[in-house]
From Swiss-Prot:
This is Arginine kinase 1. One of its GO terms (cellular component) is extracellular space. InterPro entries: ATP-guanido_PTrfase, ATP-guanido_PTrfase_AS, ATP-guanido_PTrfase_cat, ATP-guanido_PTrfase_N, ATP-guanido_PTrfase_N_sf, Gln_synth/guanido_kin_cat_dom. The lineage of its organism: Eukaryota, Metazoa, Ecdysozoa, Arthropoda, Hexapoda. One of its GO terms (biological process) is phosphorylation. PROSITE patterns: PHOSPHAGEN_KINASE, PHOSPHAGEN_KINASE_C, PHOSPHAGEN_KINASE_N. Disulfide bonds: none annotated. It comes from Drosophila melanogaster (Fruit fly). SUPFAM superfamilies: Glutamine synthetase/guanido kinase (SSF55931), Guanido kinase N-terminal domain (SSF48034).
Length: 356
């Protein structure tokens, strides 16, 4: 049963959202009918309610999406809301569709997107993973956070070769270490208001940590937005090298930590925008000519399913004509195909910038 106080909060939040001019996918798909159908449902294991799913979007009317999954079962229990949002965001991934089996393809296919080193400042490929047997952020206890951190820390300490490095827990971190990680742009902060409203930041900084290799080209975030964010990056445009490093790491970690996977949705994550491959392949790129013609930039981006963000990521501006550009689609295609969309799109953008 859903608590009366929760229901009251839902009704009030829904009324405000319905009356707002919010452009979020939540507002678009949370019709009165869907709302009434879901407001009394709870997930079987962790007893998550519709409020847990939508409260970030209820509080932040400027959300792009506005919903999160408090636990894996939420994707099924609240499917009437998740499915249309997933379909809208992931370019027509319908509720009858099934995400393909994981396939990283031939890692030697990709070369350098910018061999002359004129446009691409840095390249990064990341994926998200959830550990089997644990819910997502809002349902985790402090003990679970700590237990997960120790599992992750011991798993990563077994990595060798290029991936060998050190794990830094956020709890009790020395000031000098903290400053170094900030300078390297590695340190994640307590979540923004979108994550705060989704209850993704409880017991902070318990159970949170950062691992990086000695060369600072491989990074793992433990219990930021997802249980694990696995990141490979470096200066320049050598996507091939960066992708290969990521794939090696994911395969190594998966041998030791079982990941949550769903036959239909692929790898499960806290935010529905990251489902499926969970892959986000991005570049920081200077395209001053295209930057002065934003419409053209957006047009090419749309054609190749690319997402254009400001220099410092979501909800930021482009500084000095530098954009963060990545693949937008993560579902209904393989990991290899997701990275290839970005590779082809960036290649095209550079060609266009040169011709202007």
């Amino acid at each position: 049963m859903v608590d009366a106080a929760v229901l009251a909060k839902l009704e009030e939040g829904y009324a405000k959202l319905a009356a707002s001019d919010s452009k979020s996918l939540l507002k678009k798909y949370l019709t009165k009918e869907v709302f009434d159908n879901l407001k009394n449902k709870v997930t079987p294991t962790f007893k998550s309610t519709l409020l847990d799913v939508i409260q970030s979007g209820l509080e932040n009317h400027d959300s792009g999406v506005g919903i999160y999954a408090p636990d894996a079962e939420a994707y099924t229990v609240f499917a009437d809301l998740f499915d249309p949002i997933i379909e809208d965001y992931h370019g027509g991934f319908k509720k009858t569709d099934k995400h393909p089996a994981s396939n990283f393809g031939d890692v030697s296919t990709f070369g350098n997107v910018d061999p002359t080193n004129e446009y691409v400042i840095s390249t990064r490929v990341r994926c998200g993973r959830s550990m089997q047997g644990y819910p997502f952020n809002p349902c985790l206890t402090e003990a679970q956070y700590k237990e997960m951190e120790s599992k992750v820390s011991s798993t990563l300490s077994g990595l060798e070769g290029e991936l060998k490095g050190k794990f830094y827990p956020l709890t009790g971190m020395e000031k000098a270490v903290q400053q170094q990680l900030i300078d390297d742009h590695f340190l994640f902060k307590e979540g923004d208001r979108f994550l705060q409203a989704a209850n993704a930041c409880r017991f902070w900084p318990s159970g949170r940590g950062i691992y990086h290799n000695d060369a600072k080209t491989f990074l793992v975030w433990c219990n930021e937005e997802d249980h694990l964010r696995i990141i490979s990056m470096q200066q320049g445009g050598d996507l091939g090298q960066i992708y290969k490093r990521l794939v090696t790491a994911v395969n190594e970690i998966e041998k030791r930590v079982p990941f949550s996977h769903d036959d239909r949705l692929g790898f499960l994550t806290f935010c529905p925008t990251n489902l499926g491959t969970t892959i986000r392949a991005s570049v920081h790129i200077k395209v001053p000519k295209l930057a002065s013609n934003k419409a053209k930039l957006e047009e090419v981006a749309a054609k190749y399913n690319l997402q254009v963000r400001g220099t410092r990521g979501e909800h930021t501006e482009a500084e000095g004509g530098v954009y963060d550009i990545s693949n937008k689609r993560r579902m209904g295609l393989t990991e290899f195909e997701a990275v290839k969309e970005m590779y082809d799109g960036i290649t095209e953008l550079i060609k266009l910038e040169k011709s202007l």
